[in-house]
A protein has these predicted regions:
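Intrinsically disordered, low-complexity regulatory regions
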Residues: 1-100
Length: 100
């Protein structure tokens, strides 16, 4: 896949079908962050005492989902992992710049 094709495929996903299926990235990632936080505090109460992170933000979720894709890329070269990574990075950038 050429870089323009990867970016276009990511644009189609994050600006079309994914948003229609799951809502805006900001809202969806905020919900994911809340659920991850609840899970981590319940599953690992010792972390809650030593970590200052009380809230996983939408930007955090987008960044960590990007890292998940990086881990997948490290073990294979599926085109959709690169497309998804581009999409998560774009969402993280949009969320971060909207916060400023």
């Amino acid at each position: 896949m050429k870089r323009a094709e990867i970016l276009e495929a990511a644009r189609v996903c994050v600006c079309g079908e994914r948003e229609q299926d799951y809502g805006t990235p900001e809202n969806n990632f905020e919900t994911i962050g809340l659920l991850w936080g609840v899970y981590l505090r319940a599953a690992h109460p010792e972390l809650a005492r030593v970590m200052a992170v009380n809230h996983i933000t939408a930007k955090d979720v987008a960044a960590m989902m990007g890292l998940l894709k990086v881990a997948r890329i490290a073990t294979g070269n599926k085109a959709d992992s690169f497309v998804d990574l581009a999409g998560y990075v774009a969402c993280a950038g949009e969320i971060a710049t909207a916060e400023d």
